A protein has these predicted regions:
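Bacterial N-terminal signal peptides
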Residues: 1-10
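N-terminal pre-domain segments of enzymes
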Residues: 12-62
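Trp- and acidic/polar-enriched beta-sheet ligand-binding modules for extracellular glycan
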Residues: 17-34, 74-76, 98-107, 115-116, ...
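Predominantly extracellular/luminal regions of secreted and cell-surface proteins
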Residues: 54, 58-90
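Eukaryotic beta-rich interaction modules
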Residues: 89-94, 102-104
Length: 179
């Protein structure tokens, strides 16, 4: 598991729809080259698209509040990289741009240090190889122990193998656009 994350947020009053604009995301260079030989499709896998995804709409002036913030993880000794790479803003797929966690259910937690109204969460797994990402769960909470007030925003765990409930979101092919 390798990833990076961007959280766009502000701590202002909710803006009117007229004040929304596309979230300014600087996407990394597409890293996967070639044609995949095995495309595992099925009812739980979102087919890959050759079109750009629709922009996230957010109030003017939002910023990445996760950038540079402290990251903790269930994996205390990543295979490659440091946990700080999760929030350093670098979304490229070269060897110095990501942290790789050991295979098994893992989590990362970003401490935003204060409460924000979050408008978008964008994350990147490794996007230099063709693979489907399973059991991706995004949760937020004001509780640092994630015991109370936990809200699940995304869950594609179709069999509850991560123990966080069965998700309704689809598994997906990672690409340079993130998720």
């Amino acid at each position: 598991m390798s990833l990076g994350v961007a959280l766009a947020a502000q701590n202002l009053v909710v803006a009117a729809d007229a004040d929304l604009e596309p979230l300014p995301l600087k996407l990394p260079i597409p890293a996967f080259m070639g044609t995949p030989t095995d495309m595992p499709l099925g009812p739980h896998v979102e087919p890959p698209s050759d079109k750009p995804r629709a922009p996230f709409m957010a109030p003017k002036g939002v910023k990445n509040v996760a950038e540079g913030k402290k990251v903790t993880s269930s994996d205390k000794n990543p295979i490659t990289g440091e946990l700080s790479l999760v929030t350093d803003g670098d979304k490229e797929s070269n060897d110095n741009s990501f942290v790789e966690l050991h295979r098994r259910t893992q989590w990362v937690q970003v401490d935003l240090e204060k409460r924000y109204k979050i408008h978008a969460i964008v994350l990147w797994h490794a996007h230099n190889t063709w693979q489907v990402y399973h059991d991706v769960i995004v949760q937020v909470s004001d509780d640092p122990d994630f015991i109370e007030g936990v809200k699940t925003l995304y869950n594609n765990d179709i069999d509850n193998s991560s123990g966080q409930g069965i998700g309704k979101d689809k598994e997906y092919f990672e690409d340079y656009q993130g998720r």
